[in-house]
Each structure stands twice: as C-alpha cells, then as structure tokens.
C-alpha cells in the first residue's frame, strides 16, 4: 500500500484507515519541518512494527527524541552516511559496531547496516551477510531491501 498526501510539496500527515501489519517508512518523504511533525505524530500513535530507511533515519538523526517513540524491534536500515548521522563519527570498525550495539540496546531496535557486507545488529549480537557484491551499490537497492524486510 502506498499513502499519498494532499500537500504536493511535502508530507504533512501520515495515517491509515486500517491497522497495517508492518509499515516501511522514510523513502523519499523528505525532512521538511512539517514532515518531521507528521512523522512525530505518526510515531506517537502508531501500533505497527516499523522498518525505517532513508529520510526516516535522517529525521531520527536530527531529532534524537524520536528514537524513544519507536516500537520495540523497529528495523533501521542505514547506509554508512545515514549511520554516521545517527550514531556520530567512529574511529574504526570496532568503534562503529560498539556504537551501533549501544543504539540497538538502548532503543531495542534492529539495525541493518547496508554495505558490501551487510551487518545486522540486535540484542548485542552481530550477523554478517558476506554474500553482497558491488551491484548492491546501485541507487534504489536499499529501497528494495526496505521493501523486502517490510
């Protein structure tokens, strides 16, 4: 299902007439202040599991208080730059993974770090998918991953 908004310039409301079994959100919705307000209102009333990518992650990065509104086991799917915005700069790969584990634990979320070797972090554990290839660095492949997880 795809939701539309009456405002052609930005998303100003996010609502459903039915209770979805899961919601994938963030791809292409922008980060305008009105969209952030709509995202906040959605998170405050949402009862469905979430998969958050792209601009959804960017809104969480700029508004860290929104992390407290996420349902347990929400899936976040950042690429490296989105991850940096979310957890800050890291010194090395070990530091990066420690920061992601801390985020996952504090907010009870699942983090899928997209890359040549995608890494899933949850409950203090790391799961590494070594089957990736350079073809996954194609624009839109992360959007497809979000759809598959959703």
Which sequence ranges carry the predicted segments?
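Glycine-rich phosphate/dinucleotide-binding loop and adjoining beta-alpha-beta core of small-molecule
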Residues: 1-131
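Short, small-residue alpha-helix embedded
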Residues: 85, 138-150
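Short pre-catalytic strand/loop immediately N-terminal to key active-site residues, enriched for Gly-Thr
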Residues: 128-140
């Amino acid at each position: 299902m795809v939701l539309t908004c009456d405002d052609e310039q930005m998303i100003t409301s996010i609502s459903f007439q039915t209770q979805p079994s899961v919601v994938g959100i963030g791809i292409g919705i922008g980060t305008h202040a009105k969209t952030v307000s709509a995202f906040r209102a959605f998170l405050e009333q949402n009862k469905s599991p979430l998969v958050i990518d792209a601009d959804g992650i960017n809104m969480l990065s700029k508004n860290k208080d929104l992390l407290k509104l996420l349902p347990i086991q929400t899936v976040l799917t950042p690429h490296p730059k989105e991850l940096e915005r979310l957890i800050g700069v890291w010194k090395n790969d070990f530091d990066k993974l420690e920061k992601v584990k801390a985020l996952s634990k504090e907010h009870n979320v699942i983090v899928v770090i997209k890359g040549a070797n995608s890494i899933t972090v949850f409950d203090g554990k790391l799961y590494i998918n070594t089957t990736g290839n350079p073809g996954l660095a194609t624009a839109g492949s992360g959007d497809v991953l979000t759809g598959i997880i959703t």
